[in-house]
Amino acid sequence: MTVEYYRKRLIDLRAQVAKEREAKKKDNERYAGYIKSASTPSSKASYRKQKIDHAASHDRRIESLKREIERTNDALKRERERAKKR
């Protein structure tokens, strides 16, 4: 792998994190509307649970992407060191 590959990978991963944060924000807004317009207490509770579950899912995905960014940064550093030795 080349240094350029890792740079592009980092850009892509950062864009994915931004998209995931935006998706989380939109989901939260959507579920807030569902909760507000729910007609029964049980449906409100169900929407609240779904909102929490979906937010947690987005959080896990964001954390996963952050770990991937860290791994890619480490790989980029190793590749730069290897390039210096050549």
What function would you assign to each model-found segment?
Residues 2, 6-9, 61-86:
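Long amphipathic alpha-helical coiled-coil segments
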Residues 8, 12, 19, 29, ...:
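Charged/polar, solvent-exposed surface patches and flexible loops
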Residues 1-25, 57-60:
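Short, charge/polar-rich alpha-helical segments
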